[in-house]
């Protein structure tokens, strides 16, 4: 009976460690995904601003180059 308890305790301990490692890996994966999502979010905010600036300055540049203002 004592050896059975010992074996069950060992299995419980190893299972707990395994679950802990899985949780750490899952948290690390979520952090990596969050960084990727932030990069995409920054990119989404940056591109419209860049397009807006280009829309404002492009006609002025074309006007000066062609001298048809």
Swiss-Prot record:
Organ and tissue specificity: Expressed by the skin glands.
Signal peptide interval: 1-22
Nuclease is among the record's keywords: no
Highest taxon in the source lineage: Eukaryota
Cross-referenced InterPro entries: Antimicrobial_frog_1, Frog_antimicrobial_propeptide
Keywords, comma-separated and alphabetical: Amphibian defense peptide, Antibiotic, Antimicrobial, Cleavage on pair of basic residues, Cytolysis, Disulfide bond, Fungicide, Hemolysis, Secreted, Signal
Gene Ontology, cellular component aspect: extracellular region
Propeptide cleavage-removed residue intervals: 23-43
Disulfide-bond pairs as recorded: 63-69
Primary residence: secreted
Subcellular location, record wording: Secreted
GO biological process: defense response to bacterium; defense response to fungus; killing of cells of another organism
Family (UniProt): Belongs to the frog skin active peptide (FSAP) family. Brevinin subfamily.
Function of the molecule: Antimicrobial peptide active against a variety of Gram-positive and Gram-negative bacterial strains. Has antifungal activity against C.albicans ATCC 10231 and a slime mold isolate. Has hemolytic activity against human erythrocytes.
Protein name, per record: Brevinin-1CG5
């Amino acid at each position: 009976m004592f050896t059975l308890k010992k074996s069950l305790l060992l299995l419980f301990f190893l299972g707990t460690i395994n679950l802990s490692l899985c949780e750490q890996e899952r948290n690390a994966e979520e952090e990596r995904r969050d960084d990727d999502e932030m990069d995409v979010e920054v990119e989404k905010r940056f591109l419209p601003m860049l397009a807006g600036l280009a829309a404002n300055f492009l006609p002025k540049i074309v006007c000066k180059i062609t001298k048809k203002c």
